[in-house]
């Protein structure tokens, strides 16, 4: 018996049902890698960020997430080079879906119980996504804006429902606006830290502030 189509599990009908000591024997998710491209690029190298945002409350299978990841990565490598971007899949498939297997061979009615004891066995995992939640993000250089939009557009076809493509006003994967980012770094209010930044608040010990601005 093959894999049941994902359209059967598209809608969020049940409560979240994660893998646990009560829910065992769950097959591994198809998606194992969530970050691609130049992951260790400094925060100031990739200022532009594009998001794919869900427009529906639904479930996305781990197979669909993997297919979208491969599709976006292939296009970005071809158009920007393998070191010209950083893709991050922002959903993780934690919800376990079940299947109540039915036999279809001759004499099946003697072997199975139909809908008696219909709580199924784990079949796979899906990610539950809300309206306005980000599915996938890409950060890159400013000149690659059109390539980001096209990569996300191609990846959209791997998912059910509707998604929107949004070019962020933030700097890269940070939560700070792009127009204020460089000023705050110059004033040492933000300290670059890998692909993110550390925020230095106004409060705190004066000695630390003096050491930072010396």
Curated annotation (Swiss-Prot):
Q: Name one GO biological process term.
A: ribosomal large subunit assembly
One term under GO cellular component: endoplasmic reticulum
Question: Where does this chain mainly localize?
Answer: cytoplasm
Q: Which UniProt keywords apply?
A: Cytoplasm, Differentiation, Meiosis, Ribonucleoprotein, Ribosomal protein, Spermatogenesis
Q: Which InterPro entries match?
A: Ribosomal_uL16, Ribosomal_uL16_CS_euk_arc, Ribosomal_uL16_dom, Ribosomal_uL16_euk_arch, Ribosomal_uL16_sf
Q: Which GO terms describe its molecular function?
A: structural constituent of ribosome
Q: Where in the cell is it found?
A: Cytoplasm
Q: Which family does it belong to?
A: Belongs to the universal ribosomal protein uL16 family.
What is the role of the protein in this entry? Testis-specific component of the ribosome, which is required for the transition from prophase to metaphase in male meiosis I. Compensates for the inactivated X-linked RPL10 paralog during spermatogenesis. The ribosome is a large ribonucleoprotein complex responsible for the synthesis of proteins in the cell. The small ribosomal subunit (SSU) binds messenger RNAs (mRNAs) and translates the encoded message by selecting cognate aminoacyl-transfer RNA (tRNA) molecules.
Q: Which NCBIfam families match?
A: PRK04199.1-4, uL16_euk_arch
User: How would you summarize the oligomeric state and partners of this protein?
Assistant: Component of the 60S large ribosomal subunit (LSU).
User: What is the protein's name according to its record?
Assistant: Large ribosomal subunit protein uL16-like
Give the species: Bos taurus
Q: Which gene encodes it?
A: RPL10L
């Amino acid at each position: 018996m093959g894999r049941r189509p994902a359209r059967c599990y598209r809608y969020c009908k049940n409560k979240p049902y994660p893998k646990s000591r009560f829910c065992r024997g769950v097959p591994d998710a198809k998606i194992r890698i969530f970050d691609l491209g130049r992951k260790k690029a400094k925060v100031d190298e990739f200022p532009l960020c594009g998001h794919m945002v869900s427009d529906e409350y639904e479930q996305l299978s781990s197979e669909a997430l993997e297919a979208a990841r491969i599709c976006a990565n292939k296009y970005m490598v071809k158009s920007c080079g393998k070191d010209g971007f950083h893709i991050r899949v922002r959903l993780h498939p934690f919800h376990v879906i079940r299947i109540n297997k039915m036999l279809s061979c001759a004499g099946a009615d003697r072997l199975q119980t139909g809908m008696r004891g219909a709580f199924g066995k784990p079949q796979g995992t899906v990610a539950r996504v809300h309206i306005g939640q980000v599915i996938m993000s890409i950060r890159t250089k400013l000149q690659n804006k059109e390539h980001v939009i096209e990569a996300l557009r191609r990846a959209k076809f791997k998912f059910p429902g509707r998604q929107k493509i949004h070019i962020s006003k933030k700097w890269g994967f940070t939560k700070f606006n792009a127009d204020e980012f460089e000023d705050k770094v110059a004033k040492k209010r933000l300290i670059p830290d890998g692909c993110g930044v550390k925020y230095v608040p106004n409060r705190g010990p004066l000695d630390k502030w003096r050491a930072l601005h010396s």
